[in-house]
Amino acid sequence: MRKTKLAVGLLCVMWAAQFAVAQIRTIEVLADKDSRYKIAGEKTPEIRVKAGESLLLRITARKAQSMSRDGSIHGFTLLHASDRSRVPGWDFTLKPGVQEFHVTAPSQPGEYVVVCTVICSDDHEGMNMKFVVEP
């Protein structure tokens, strides 16, 4: 009887661990033709995450005025707000349509900024968005 309870308990723990790993938050981003980032359901384009959180970025890119030679129409790069250095693993070029990226939020809490790295229009410099990592 004791072995049965132990086995059932172990199976429950294993199932719970698999379920916890499968829970990845999806963030819907629009890299729009007006050279602006937009977040589904939000008035202000800002992303807030927990340090080390697993994320699925689902980014829809719409063509602006121009594109790069490789067909990219926008970029999505995460920078440290303090010194504008790039965050490793957070540098994507976007082609028209929907693309998904599995990423892990930075482990260091603080303010970051998402910038477009493809010259997409005359207003390209305005294509940025606040990104906050909470403890």
Segments the model singles out, each with a brief description of its role:
Residues 1-8:
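Bacterial N-terminal signal peptides that target proteins for export
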Residues 8-17:
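Bacterial N-terminal signal peptides
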Residues 20-135:
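Extracytoplasmic copper-binding redox domains, predominantly the cupredoxin/blue-copper superfamily
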